[in-house]
A protein has these predicted regions:
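Alpha-helical elements of the RecA-like P-loop NTPase motor core of helicases
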Residues: 3, 29, 33, 55, ...
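SF2 helicase motor core recognition
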Residues: 68-88, 95, 103-108
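Short glycine-/polar-rich loops that comprise or flank the Walker A/P-loop
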Residues: 38-41, 82-86, 112-117
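Conserved helicase ATPase core of P-loop NTP-dependent helicases/translocases
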Residues: 19, 27-76
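Residue-level signal for alpha-helix termini/capping positions
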Residues: 10, 14, 36, 62-63, ...
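Residues at the C-termini of beta-strands that transition into short coil/loop
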Residues: 46-48, 91, 122
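C-terminal helicase lobe
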Residues: 63, 79, 96-101, 105-176
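Conserved interdomain hinge at the start of the Helicase C-terminal
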Residues: 1-34, 142-149
């Protein structure tokens, strides 16, 4: 699932503060190690990390001393770092709650921040649709079955977007 995450981070978010959601502690440590090898300030944290290590990672990201925090099932909710400009989904999930909460870590407004970039290496968008997609919420539950998500992925820039004849990110025209 890690794939070309370093290359994509360099291309789309170089130097921006980012949080990576990983599959396990070992995976988070591996991804953080790869980022460090590429010259970035990165750490891995998890529920097994000491409270002081988690607090230091949070402060480091807030203050800009860290560029990437790789976490294993830790920062899904309750973390407020408005400066986060990149979310990396490096684990698949059938949970809409996880998906929206993970992306929500980067949706806070901050001075100078113009947008959030989501590097979805796990294909969560194809399971759940775009995070800003209208959803029907109900306390009655819903029927189980395959959910159709209206998403198209540009072959030129890999942007995932609502179906359209032209990619809104790079202008690629899809064949008719």
């Amino acid at each position: 699932i890690t794939g070309d995450v370093i290359k994509h981070y360099q291309k789309y978010c170089n130097g921006k503060r980012a949080v990576a959601f990983c599959t396990s502690i070992k995976h988070a440590e591996h991804v953080a190690s790869e980022f460090r090898a590429a010259g970035y300030k990165a750490v891995a944290i998890s529920g097994e990390s000491k409270r002081s290590e988690r607090a230091e990672a949070l402060a480091g990201l807030r203050e800009g001393r860290l560029q990437v925090v790789c976490n294993a099932q830790l920062w899904v909710a309750g973390v407020d770092v408005p400066q986060i400009e990149c979310i990396m989904l490096l684990r698949p999930s059938k949970s809409l709650t996880f998906y929206l909460q993970a992306i929500g870590r980067g949706l806070r407004v901050a001075p100078g921040k113009t947008h959030l970039t989501v590097l979805d290496h796990a294909g969560c968008i194809f399971e759940h649709g775009p995070p800003d997609m209208e959803r029907k919420w109900s306390l009655q539950g819903r029927q189980k079955g395959k959910r159709a998500t209206p998403v198209r992925q540009c072959p030129a820039c890999f942007c995932a977007h609502a179906p359209a004849p032209v990619c809104p990110e790079c202008g690629y025209r899809y064949p008719a």
